[in-house]
């Protein structure tokens, strides 16, 4: 926060290091830093535990979870991480951005889409939820027709 100037964005070769007792404490600290000056941007983690990667992606307000990579370089895209090359990362609606991904050439193309009528496919709720209702022994399946 404001009392810790190195917790904000730095466009200089400075590394801020924080200590945490465990993963949950580290996640809480990362969330505080994101909410100060980074909401929507990205979070990096070095781990082999997929559940922790998923937890960060679900719980933190970020558009990118950088896994086992040099965060500084990985957010800008790479041939080996699937992110498009960019010097400008969108932070989604968390930062009132119109994009939540790496700004790249596709954002500057005008693409015309041709739309024609196609046969409609409406969801049949009874069929859609049938397996769930049967597995969970619920009577709600009968009420879907109402």
Predicted regions and their residues:
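Conserved C-terminal structural/oligomerization subdomain of aldehyde/semialdehyde dehydrogenase
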Residues: 1-146
